[in-house]
């Protein structure tokens, strides 16, 4: 059933330390069970690790660069045409692009072998700035799928 009006977007307040909205959004992605203080500790710990490993480099800049590298441009969506399902490549909206990048970054960091989550996240962020790592692998996989199914792009939604 369609909605009568568009649902307003919730405004996310910037994080307390850096005053960055994207970092606050990522904090919400990392957070589990409403434990924001834990998520805060993980993220700020990761940014401190980045600063320690690369003195003089702004950790917030590294975070934005990593997210920018992970963002997917295209993805595939299933479309049923004449009894067959086709994987149709579609462009990703900017808001979804950001959400996917953050989700993939979190998942890739979780799967790493380091001792603490903040260390895992720091290393994943550093690798993403260099164009490597699990999150980048995921993005490349999605791009490859879209490229492989380019022939079905005329089935756009």
Curated annotation (Swiss-Prot):
UniProt keywords, alphabetically: Ribonucleoprotein, Ribosomal protein, RNA-binding, rRNA-binding, tRNA-binding
Q: Which InterPro entries match?
A: Ribosomal_uS7, Ribosomal_uS7_bac/org-type, Ribosomal_uS7_CS, Ribosomal_uS7_dom, Ribosomal_uS7_dom_sf
The keyword NAD appears for this protein: no
Q: Which Pfam families match?
A: Ribosomal_S7 (PF00177)
User: Its family?
Assistant: Belongs to the universal ribosomal protein uS7 family.
CC per GO annotation: small ribosomal subunit
Relate the assembly described in the record: Part of the 30S ribosomal subunit. Contacts proteins S9 and S11.
What is the protein named?
Small ribosomal subunit protein uS7
Q: Which GO terms describe its biological process?
A: translation
Q: Which organism is it from?
A: Polaromonas naphthalenivorans (strain CJ2)
Q: Which PANTHER family match?
A: RIBOSOMAL PROTEIN S7
Q: What job does the chain carry out? A: One of the primary rRNA binding proteins, it binds directly to 16S rRNA where it nucleates assembly of the head domain of the 30S subunit. Is located at the subunit interface close to the decoding center, probably blocks exit of the E-site tRNA.
The gene coding this protein: rpsG
Q: A Gene Ontology MF term for this entry?
A: tRNA binding
PROSITE patterns (alphabetical)? RIBOSOMAL_S7 (PS00052)
Q: Does the keyword Ribosomal protein apply?
A: yes
